Structure formats: C-alpha cells, structure tokens
C-alpha cells in the first residue's frame, strides 16, 4: 500500500513536515477554499501541488472534489456544475493527479454527535449516539415524520435524554451535526438546515440513484478519457438519516454503480470505518469482489455499542473491523495487479485517529489530530509488513 496522509492545506495544524516524519510519502488534500461547483484552475492546482512537492511529498489523491447540491437534487444549474466538474477533472489530469475521492451524500457529509468522547485510557474519540441523534431530530430540529425512523424505546430514551440536556448541551449537539466536520464543504444554521432538508422531500432512494446515474454518465467518460480514477466514498453512517436516502452503503450499492456505468474509471474508496458500521457489510468480501476498482483506502475501525446504531471510533487494530484480514485482502489485490504487469499500489491513509498525549492540549481538527493517526499508520504499516513477509516474500 502507498502510505498517505490527509492534509487540510496551509491552515492545517498538522504540517507537511509532520506528515513526512510520520512516514507517509503521499498527501491527500483538496482545494477547500474554492466554492462548491467552481472549476479548480490549473494555476490553483499547481500552487497546491508545488507546496506538497517542496516538502518532499507527492499529491497522491484528491479528497474531495465536492459535488454541488444542485447535482444531487437535479435542480438549478446542475448541468453547469457538472460541466465545471468535468473541467476540474481535466485540469487535475493535466497536472498529473489521477485519483479523486468523492461522495454523493445529500446535505450532510459524515456525521457524529460527540467529537470528544472520552475513552477509558483518557484519549478522545468521535462517536455517533443513536439516542442523542434522535433527541436532536425529534426535539431540536423537530423534523416532521421523524418518529417513523425510530423504535418506541428509542423515542422514549431520546425524550429522557433531551430532558437532561442543558442549553449548552443542545447547542453543542446541534453544532456537531450541522456545522460541518473536517472535509465537509457545507455548514448550516438550523433554519438553513431545515430548508436544505426540504429540498429532498420528494427524493427517495430510487430518485437519488437516478440523479447519481446522471452524474456518473456525464463524469465517468471524461475521467476515462483523461486517465482519472473516480473513487466514491461510502455514506457515513451507511444508512438513511434525517429522512434522507443513502445510496453508497452496501455491496448491493457497489454492484449497482458498476452496472450503471461499467467503466474502470468508476471505482471505490474502501473506507472500513464507514462500511464497517453495518454488521451486514462483509468488508473482505467487498474487497475481493471489487478489488480491481478499489483506488483508495481509508483504514480505521469502529465499535458498535449496546444499541447497534450507536458506535464510536475504536483504535485502528481493535473494534469491529478485522484489520488483519482487510489489509491481507488489499495486499492480495496489489499482488494480483503486479502479476498482471501493473505496479499500481493502492493509496492508504490512516483515518480518524484518537486525540491523545499532548494533542489533548492542542486545537485539532476532529478525528485528524497528528498522534492518533501516527499511531494508526504505524500499526497498519506493521500489519502490512508482517503479511508481506509471511505470504509474499520469496
């Protein structure tokens, strides 16, 4: 695997020098300062690329070129935004950047309720609490019809939880859900959030798939033409939330994508922490079935709690993800490629580390502090080395 590291640009508290010292050789970044839908110019791409290369690193993966909400709802200037997206892909290819991670999650990107969940050892993790999320949706957002998405017991628990919340607790929960987490390009006030949700009132899973298919049929031929590999990121969490459909959550969704646009440019990001939240997702089987189309991996683990829809981010080698078997399957795919004459390593980044040690005293991007990811990268690197030596050394 090619070891990479997500970097949020010049304002990231983790520097490129830190990244290099961590042992990564590739950088995963994006032009977050460019508004959604606008073209990434060659000049802007080259500026960022030069910064990365001056630090002795390579810009390996774009994460992400965000998709404008008009494209997802098939309204407004969606065709203009698609044309702009096509041009951005051409410009990236002209600059020698050929792997693009993106997602098709409506309204929200990845979602958590607690950004400072304290673990028994004193480090902090990200957490999604199903009951707190229900409390937000039922009693703060007050989304019409939300009760249908919860069990009677969850509704009762959410009511009790909400009754114990201070005003600051309510404000913090609201911020965590709607204000935008690292990598998300959208942040909302509560009223704006309600308005955006309303734009999806007539969009179910089938309709969102229709809009996604329209996007893929416009984008993938351009990607194919210029040599860009599109790697869709799964929904996080991988299930419908807030009455919104989710369409990249299961192996069936992956198969639908391949059947919709059967091009090798139409590929996947294997995010084990997203897909792995669902007990019915067999990560190793996903890798084995779609290995040739896996162009990027996010390796992390989560741990489902008593309510299986509640989870927190576990240490990279613990939790519900069998990281050994996952890494072994990825390495096997790389060796399959090698046997066919390709030296195409799969970029991997350690995802969402715990906030720990002196990072606890620093202002960090949630999930993206340095030391927790350094630990995760070192652990995964060790697993890969052991697998390479045990199964593939001559």
Curated annotation (Swiss-Prot):
Its cofactor is Fe(2+); Mn(2+). The gene is uxuA. Pfam families: UxuA. InterPro entries: Man_deHydtase, Xyl_isomerase-like_sf. GO terms for biological process: D-glucuronate catabolic process. Pathway: Carbohydrate metabolism; pentose and glucuronate interconversion. The keyword Cell wall biogenesis/degradation does not apply. Catalyzes the dehydration of D-mannonate. Belongs to the mannonate dehydratase family. This is Mannonate dehydratase. It is an enzyme of class 4 (lyase). Keywords: Iron, Lyase, Manganese. Disulfide bonds: none annotated. Its EC number is 4.2.1.8. It comes from the Bacteria. SUPFAM superfamilies: Xylose isomerase-like (SSF51658). It catalyses: D-mannonate = 2-dehydro-3-deoxy-D-gluconate + H2O. GO terms for molecular function: ferrous iron binding; manganese ion binding; mannonate dehydratase activity.
